[in-house]
């Protein structure tokens, strides 16, 4: 996942951990961390994962086509025809598409998306070689073992097993694996263009189950939206001069005052259908003082006390509004000279439905200084929209997750960073993060050192995908 390593940490805030004993009464989603997959499909998911981790698909290494070739061979061995699997190169990377024919070939297809690339890892910093899969103490260690080769492996193994068993979906099911989600998302954009006739996207790189310290599930998150990541460059210039002769203006002073205003400003709160569903679904597991505010805001977004309570908590402030904060500043050219220019970076996470240009204009209004220019820094992100919570999709998710963990709270939400879903939502295609990894918060090392996946999640994770697909495409 790009920019925000693991979206579940945003959808289920850390403050909810305090309430785990009251929320963890559902059946365990997995037995012990040492449990390895026992089913043929689960074992195949592990084999795919090991092969994928051993292929260092870091940007610039040219290994995405290599991994795509290995995936293609596996798909062919499961009964896919050669003309149903294609790889489209794009520079040193590319994307893979595999089409599983359905009964109605004219209907719009359902997509399963994941990404083959990973972020860099320095072997000297790791306890184990990050690109040599190691199974130890019930975990598989290696770069990408969690983000996102676990999701890719389980969804792929699930589909291959269904194909071998002769299952035929109601309409075409398409596997679409991108090759640069962690960097430019150029393959994602091209993939979304090529598959723009899709009816629905299921993203293996978002959503998932949260376990408490005892290994019991307390919530499952469904990603149905993303905040737009945006950086803005603020620039102010001044004639400068010798520091012994200060004038009426100073670029550092002007920028400091502007950044103080940005820091103090609160964007208007918003309540969308997704936010409302999240707050109502999360309130039962939240500490009492927060739960009341969540319910109150979901009922009345003008409730001042509820707004104040949620705004005061970093875990929640981003759920109810756009946030913008100063993150970098640079200026001056000599200790004894008045600064001729100062630049600052303001990072924003924009609420779905609000455009980057609207935020830029609001920031200009906030600082109220026409001498300071504000420029959006294009990093490939798109204005974000939410996916409607379709009854057929949410019903299928309920069935698949509750088969694995009866009674578990299923909470829709949005992530603070971008995934491949961004490009599909921008085309009006609903996308849902429905990852099948269940794990404890202290096991989440995506993008970090010693990234790992609990092996016990593989068997039930594959089964979750199969139930989801057979329910949606029956």
Language-model features, listed with the residues they occupy:
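Bacterial N-terminal signal peptides
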Residues: 11-22
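Acidic/histidine-rich, surface-exposed loop or edge segments in extracytoplasmic proteins
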Residues: 46-57, 235-238, 375-383
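An extended, acidic, His-containing surface patch that forms the Zn2+-binding/catalytic region
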Residues: 105-107, 210-213, 217, 270-336, ...
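Active-site metal-coordination/substrate-binding segment of hydrolases
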Residues: 107-177
């Amino acid at each position: 996942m790009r920019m925000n390593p693991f979206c579940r940490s945003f959808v289920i805030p850390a403050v909810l951990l305090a309430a785990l004993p009251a929320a963890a009464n559902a059946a365990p989603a997995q037995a012990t961390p040492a449990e390895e997959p026992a089913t043929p499909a689960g074992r195949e998911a592990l084999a795919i994962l090991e092969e994928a981790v051993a292929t260092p698909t870091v940007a610039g290494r040219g290994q995405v086509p290599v991994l795509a070739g290995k995936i293609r061979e596996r798909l062919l061995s499961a009964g896919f025809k050669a003309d149903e699997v294609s790889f489209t190169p794009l520079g040193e990377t590319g994307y893979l598409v595999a089409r599983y024919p359905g009964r109605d070939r004219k209907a719009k297809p359902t997509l399963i998306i994941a990404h083959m690339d990973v972020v860099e890892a320095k072997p000297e910093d790791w306890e184990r070689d990050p690109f040599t899969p190691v199974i130890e103490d019930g975990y598989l260690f290696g770069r990408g073992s969690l983000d996102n080769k676990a999701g890719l492996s389980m969804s792929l193994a699930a589909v291959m097993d269904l194909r071998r068993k002769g299952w035929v979906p109601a309409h075409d099911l398409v596997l679409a694996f991108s090759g640069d989600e962690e960097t430019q998302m150029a393959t994602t954009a091209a993939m979304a263009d090529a598959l723009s006739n899709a009816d629905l996207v299921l993203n293996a790189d978002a959503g998932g189950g949260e376990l408490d310290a005892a290994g019991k599930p307390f919530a499952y998150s469904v990603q149905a939206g993303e905040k737009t990541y945006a950086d803005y460059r603020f620039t102010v210039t001044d004639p400068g001069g010798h520091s012994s002769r200060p004038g009426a203006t100073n670029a550092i002073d002007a920028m400091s005052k502007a950044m103080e205003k940005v820091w103090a400003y609160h964007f208007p709160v918003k309540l969308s259908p997704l936010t409302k569903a999240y707050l109502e679904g999360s309130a039962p597991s939240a500490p009492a003082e927060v739960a009341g505010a969540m319910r109150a805001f979901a009922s009345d977004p003008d409730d001042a006390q509820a707004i104040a309570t949620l705004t005061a908590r970093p875990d929640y402030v981003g759920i109810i509004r756009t946030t913008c904060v100063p993150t970098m500043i640079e200026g001056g050219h000599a200790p004894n000279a008045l600064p001729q220019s100062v630049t600052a970076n303001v990072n924003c996470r924009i609420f779905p439905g609000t455009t980057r240009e609207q935020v830029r204009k609001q920031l200009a209004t906030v600082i109220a200084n026409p001498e300071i220019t504000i420029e959006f820094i294009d990093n490939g992100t798109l204005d974000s929209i939410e996916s409607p919570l379709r009854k057929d999709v949410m019903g299928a998710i309920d069935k698949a997750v509750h088969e694995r963990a009866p009674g578990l709270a299923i909470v829709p939400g949005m992530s603070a960073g971008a995934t491949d879903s961004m490009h599909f939502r921008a085309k009006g295609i609903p996308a849902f993060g429905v990852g099948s990894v269940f794990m404890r918060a202290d096991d989440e090392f995506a993008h970090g050192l010693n990234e790992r996946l609990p092996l016990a999640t593989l068997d039930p994770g594959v089964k979750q995908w199969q139930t989801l697909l057979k329910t949606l495409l029956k």
